[in-house]
A protein has these predicted regions:
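Hydrophobic faces of well-ordered beta-strands that scaffold small-molecule active sites
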Residues: 13-16, 38-40, 68-72, 95, ...
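Active-site beta-loop-alpha junctions enriched in small/polar residues
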Residues: 18-20, 43-45, 73-75, 100-102, ...
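Aromatic- and acidic-residue-enriched carbohydrate-binding clefts of CAZyme catalytic domains
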Residues: 116
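Short glycine-enriched loop/turn motifs at secondary-structure junctions
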Residues: 63-66, 108, 299
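Alpha/beta catalytic cores of nucleotide-metabolism and tRNA/nucleoside-modifying enzymes
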Residues: 1-9, 13, 19, 24-25, ...
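Alpha/beta enzyme core
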Residues: 32, 81-111, 120-198, 214
Length: 329
């Protein structure tokens, strides 16, 4: 699969853009375990043109994580165009437009998935951004606003006509948020549409290597995107790659090995930011990791993780888990 001149190989697997998750440390970790392309946290166009410090930091990328896409969202054409210019100066490989975020503070204001209620404006913004920058522009969106308005098949053609070079589809409507099951049949319908010639990337409910391969085989997508399943589990890319290449599950990764991966993520986050900001960011990853699923009475330990303020505190909690439960996980 290629996006313009970016060769992403066969069966590429992408790390989805996730707010407060896909910081540089996590992106590099996922890249290490096999992610073929990574995305930044989504970036507000309004905040970008106002040069808000925290937002500007989201544009920080490094060569080790390439190819990397920076994703922006907004609801005004002029603002999105100016934001696109700023993003291009950060030298990402791709600029991605978010037309899929379902949360109220974004979609409720007409941005993200809110654009699914204003297709003319969505297309206007897309054309304007494509015409503004020289790097490839891609889009991430959903099936439609609700079950009665699943418009993705026609919308995909319209977005392609605007000049985008790849389309990512999350297999839910905005109304579903993250409930119910992703409808991959509609993603497959877009891919099999003879009028579509850009790469189609599927996203939604890919939590196992078996499901990843099934999505390639059954629906013919050019790539898959992993979101929430990578949260606290960056090695999922390694597991999927191994299964696709061999048809066999990766030999079980030891609890100790996986715990050390999380330790390294803590150190990487602190080194890239500072201890206060790094811990604030990474402690949520640890608390949500499926590595700790099944540990009895884990609620209090999770709360302690979420309250930790130093590397020493977090490592002390991980040492406690290892000493008390490591042999049983």
């Amino acid at each position: 699969m290629k996006i313009r001149n970016i060769d992403l190989g066969r069966y590429p697997i992408f790390l989805a853009p996730m707010e407060d998750v896909t910081d540089p440390a996590f992106r590099l970790m996922c890249k290490k375990f096999g992610a073929d392309m990574v995305y930044t946290e989504f970036v507000s166009a309004d905040a970008l043109i106002r040069s808000v410090g925290k937002t500007m930091q989201k544009l920080n990328i490094n060569d080790e994580e390439r190819p990397v896409a920076i994703q922006i969202y907004g609801r005004d054409t002029e603002t999105m165009v100016e934001a696109a210019k700023i993003v291009e100066e950060a030298h990402p490989d791709i600029l991605d437009i978010n037309f899929g975020c379902p949360v109220k503070r974004v979609a409720g204001k007409g941005a993200g998935a809110g654009m699914l209620q204003n297709i003319p404006l969505m297309l206007e913004i897309t054309r304007a951004v494509v015409d503004t920058v020289k790097i490839p522009v891609t889009v991430k969106t959903r099936l439609g606003w609700d079950n009665e308005h699943k418009i993705i098949v026609d919308l995909a053609e319209q977005l392609q006509d605007c000049g985008i070079e790849a389309l990512t589809i999350h297999g839910r409507t905005r109304a579903q948020m993250y409930t119910g099951e992703a409808d991959w049949s509609l993603i497959g319908k877009v891919k099999k549409n003879p009028r579509m010639h850009i790469p189609i990337i599927g996203n939604g409910d890919i939590t196992t290597p078996q499901r990843a391969k099934e999505c390639f085989d059954l629906y013919g997508v050019d790539a898959i995107m992993i979101g929430r399943a990578s949260f606290g589990r960056p090695w999922i890319f390694k597991e999927i790659k191994h299964y696709i290449e061999t048809g066999k599950e990766l030999p079980a990764l030891s609890f100790e090995w996986r715990l050390n991966v999380l330790r390294q993520e803590v150190l990487d986050s602190v080194n890239l930011l500072d201890e206060r900001r790094g811990i604030l960011h990474v402690r949520r990853h640890l608390a949500a990791s499926p590595l700790f699923k099944g540990i009895p009475n884990f609620k209090e330990t999770r709360i302690a993780m979420l309250r930790a303020e130093t590397v020493k505190e977090l490592f002390s909690i991980l040492d406690y888990i290892r000493g008390n439960y490591g042999m049983n996980c």
